[in-house]
């Protein structure tokens, strides 16, 4: 949403182009971007600027249109597929991360299976799943069809097991590649860096 308060319109692509011109800045990373904010202009800016990391964290939350609608999300599965497809077409080596919610009120077994298939097909590089938490004073807290806690956790575990296999395959594909990395520090008492 960068720029809306200043210019009355979204200007993140322009900001990326300007930041990329600053000497001494080597990496620019967009940390969090809702699907509806990912425009062709943003994709083109990421693709065009070598200093902009080929990385996006896109919190899709779910892939079942039924659940997305109950959540009040502004995208559906077809739009999510189109966005991910465009990103991978324009930026083939992009790293995509997402977060999901298991057991949102009204999530059926069919909704969960649809989400599972979506994750399997999209093969995200990184993925986190959180069981829905019934927060007081939120619209979802009073929705009918609350999912039992053990079902939410089971579905989370199923998705994370799938993601582990996907991540393992992706890591195997990187064996032998030389990459530029940023070291944030050394793990105490180990020869490991993070």
Language-model features: where?
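Short acidic/polar active-site loop segments enriched in Thr and Asp
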Residues: 26, 125, 130
């Amino acid at each position: 949403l960068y720029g809306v308060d200043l210019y009355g319109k979204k200007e993140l692509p322009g900001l990326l182009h300007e930041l990329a011109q600053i000497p001494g800045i080597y990496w620019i990373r967009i940390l969090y971007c809702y699907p509806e904010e990912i425009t062709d202009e943003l994709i083109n800016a990421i693709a065009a600027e070598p200093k902009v990391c080929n990385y996006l964290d896109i919190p899709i939350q779910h892939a079942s249109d039924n659940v997305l609608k109950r959540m009040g999300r502004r995208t559906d599965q077809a739009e999510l597929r189109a966005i991910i497809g465009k990103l991978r077409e324009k930026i083939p080596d992009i790293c995509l991360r997402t977060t999901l919610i298991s057991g949102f009120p009204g999530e059926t077994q069919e909704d969960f299976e649809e989400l599972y298939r979506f994750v399997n097909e999209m093969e995200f590089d990184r993925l986190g799943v959180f069981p829905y938490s019934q927060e007081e004073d939120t619209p979802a807290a009073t929705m009918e069809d609350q999912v039992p806690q053990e079902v939410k956790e089971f579905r989370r575990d199923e998705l994370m097991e799938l993601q582990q296999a996907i991540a393992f395959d992706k890591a195997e594909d990187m064996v032998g590649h030389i990459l530029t990395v940023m070291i944030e520090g050394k793990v105490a008492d180990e020869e490991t860096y993070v």
